Amino acid sequence: MVPMNPELMHYPNQPHMMPGYPMINAYQQSYLQNPAQWTPEMLLCMQMQMQQMVPGTATNSTYMPPQSKNTVTPNATSPLSQISDRDSGNDTISPPLTSQNSATTPNYHNQPQMQLTPLQQAKPEKEEISPYAINNILSSTQSSPDNGNEADDKENSSVRRNTFPASSASTKKPRGTPYDRTNTPMTVVPQMPQFAPDFSNYNLTMNAWSEFFKKDRCMVCGDNSTGYHYGVQSCEGCKGFFRRSVHKNIAYVCTKGENCTFSYENCAANRGVRTRCQACRFAKCLAVGMNRDNVRVNKETDKDVKPSVASPNFEMTSQVKELTAAFVANMPCSTHLTSGTHAIGAIKKFIESVPALSSLLPKDEKALEMSIQKVMSGILAIRAAFTFDPITFYSCENPVNLLRGGIRNTVFNDCEVALLSGIHILQIVNGGVAEIFTSYCQGLRHQLSQTHLQEIGLCDRLLMRLGPYLNQ
């Protein structure tokens, strides 16, 4: 074939490629290794780089690309004769091209380090290689450790990255598998102890400790003891159980029978199951030494019994019934007073129906009406506070709040409202000095004690709020 001249070759336009900077294949493949494939711009850039690296070289000579003697084939290695011919026609001193199968960048002094790993190519494994070998992870082109070929070591030295230098074949040792290393038998040489402990006093020491722990344990169930109770070291649970059993004089019966023993098979008297069988627990309390006579049966001494309040007699009850009947007939709680005139008329009829009250009021009509005007405000306040009568025609907010203060149940019945109204009338008319006043107060106390059991001292509080305090 006719050799081709690089000057006569037609090169494609590459507007975006930097002249003189051939690309580096990421997978270590040769790229434009034949000088005949280089462009004139690349050769000119290389000449300028060589001039910067080696100052003082001649620059007036022109560089001519060498003629290719062989056919242009990709990925072909140029012979040394072509390198010598190219360098012979140039006055500058340029280093010869390396014979390695790699591309060299003219912009750097040395070949740049590649950051990518070589392309992993699957090869049939000859032997099982340890997965813990670092070189097997970094490069798959590494030969088997058993192969002692120096050519393979030289080839692998150019592929390895960040690893230790390859060792020679003479220093290599066969590397075993993880199974072989973990299952290698180990020879352990027994050694005699350097000291001889003395256990002569061990039993004495343990017996002393056991006696010490027994001092703080309940003799019935084995729980933590709180002291001597009824003559025996026991806990609070067994002490209370024994005291209650003696106080109530209870006769327990075991379900296992009379021949039951304190064991796990029958009835165990320990901390966990001491409450399962009360008969065996009480029997063990007596067996360990608890004394019945040490239990004080009557803990409380005889105290003077407070005299109870005397129940009201028949005469007082009749007076209260008379007052209650007059109240229900003239102004019961279910009746709503609509006006002041209606209220004055109802109060006047109520007072006239009770002889004990009418005898204390004046006989004159004008004086009677004036007395009724004085007691009307208090009676209306009592109805508004303890009944469902709203009393819309009279403003008595302050007296109502005074009566209701501190009372839980503010709804009273007819008897209670009648007694409160009668007591209020007596306090306004003669200051509560009449004999009937005491009967009304006792009747109110007795009635409140039956309907307001949780209201302690309710009668005394109400008596203090009646009378002149409601008219202020």
Swiss-Prot record:
Chief location category: nucleus
Pfam families named in the record: zf-C4 (PF00105)
Disordered: annotated segments: 57-112, 138-184
Superkingdom: Eukaryota
Signal peptide range in chain numbering: none
Biased segments, Polar residues type: 57-83, 90-112, 138-147, 159-171
Location in or out of the cell: Nucleus
Alphabetized SUPFAM superfamilies for the sequence: Glucocorticoid receptor-like (DNA-binding domain)
DNA-binding region: 215-297
Any single Gene Ontology cellular-component annotation: nucleus
Keywords, comma-separated and alphabetical: DNA-binding, Metal-binding, Nucleus, Receptor, Transcription, Transcription regulation, Zinc, Zinc-finger
Biological role: Orphan nuclear receptor.
Protein name: Nuclear hormone receptor family member nhr-2
Gene, per the UniProt record: nhr-2
